[in-house]
From Swiss-Prot:
One of its GO terms (molecular function) is isomerase activity. Signal peptide: none annotated. It catalyses: (2Z,4E)-2-hydroxyhexa-2,4-dienedioate = (3E)-2-oxohex-3-enedioate. The active site is at P2 (proton acceptor). Its EC number is 5.3.2.6. Homohexamer. This is 2-hydroxymuconate tautomerase. Catalyzes the ketonization of 2-hydroxymuconate stereoselectively to yield 2-oxo-3-hexenedioate. It comes from Pseudomonas sp. (strain CF600). InterPro entries: 4-OT, 4-OT-like_dom, Tautomerase/MIF_sf.
Length: 63
């Protein structure tokens, strides 16, 4: 069972996360020749101040 664990900065809509899940699942199923119904996708949303970019919190880097 292929599993993808994705970490994203909070703030995406439910629709965007649904699209992400669908597209990642399809890509994994196609590239691994796995049944789509066996693919799992886990999304962990991170607060901007818990995510670093270039040594700085994303809350300071991304506005």
């Amino acid at each position: 069972m292929p599993i993808a664990q994705l970490y994203i900065i909070e703030g995406r809509t439910d629709e965007q996360k649904e699209t992400l899940i669908r597209q990642v699942s399809e890509a994994m199923a196609n590239s691994l020749d796995a049944p789509l119904e066996r693919v799992r996708v886990l999304i962990t949303e991170m607060p901007k101040n818990h995510f670093g970019i270039g040594g700085e919190p994303a809350s300071k880097v991304r506005r």
